[in-house]
UniProtKB/Swiss-Prot annotation:
Phosphorylated by SERP2405. The modification 4-aspartylphosphate is found at residue 55. Its main location: cytoplasm. PANTHER family: HISTIDINE KINASE-RELATED, TRANSCRIPTIONAL REGULATORY PROTEIN HPTR. Residues 3-118 form the Response regulatory domain. This is Uncharacterized response regulatory protein SERP2406. It is found in: Cytoplasm. InterPro entries: CheY-like_superfamily (IPR011006), Homeodomain-like_sf (IPR009057), HptR (IPR051552), HTH_AraC (IPR018060), Sig_transdc_resp-reg_receiver (IPR001789).
Amino acid sequence: MFKVIICDDERIIREGLKQMVPWEDYHFTTVYTAKDGVEALSLIRQHQPELVITDIRMPRKNGVDLLDDIKDLDCQIIILSSYDDFEYMKAGIQHHVLDYLLKPVDHTQLEHILDILVQRLLERPHSTNDDAAYHTAFQPLLKIDYDDYYVNQILSQIKQHYHKKVTVLDLINPIDVSESYAMRTFKEHVGITIVDYLNRYRILKSLHLLDQHYKHYEIAEKVGFSEYKMFCYHFKKYLHMSPSDYNKQSK
């Protein structure tokens, strides 16, 4: 549902951030990249992202100038910088950026920031019923680490195998725990059943594929539903709209 724009004149950095960060786990279904501030500004105006990650030193339009251009927009900013960019960083302080990250980017640090940001985004007042449905559907997926070993192992199995036609038994067999204990413990810690979590996670993953304009029957197969009808049923169950309605809304 959320969108992010990554702006850096070094291709290896912007593509690295795009590919290495598990954006969908943080509800960012669309990731755009730009090689300078001019490209970024065009993308920002066109797509209205919730998050912009930008370098400071860039050709044509630097990061500080970009911040000036988007200061009135409702989006969060993370600045990328080198050790010798302190003067530029001071100039960006007035824009109340979300955080600063030094290059090379520590992905663990970035994911910690994203974890906090996505909770903040999902806690915002909802402007439409569709936003509220999204919040309700994916709220249980926000927490990605629990105190219980078996719960964390089940979550890991879901994220590795959601695209397959798996059962609860398939997910817990590698963990060496009884089915009844696993189901009871998961429900106690997460608040929903393993099957419910699996289906919500599949629907979350399907949003990224919908944004890429895959056919709906292809998406159903790619996220692990045995039938197209089951994909549509669960999509409407959680988001209160059909996949086709979602496509229309996203245009």
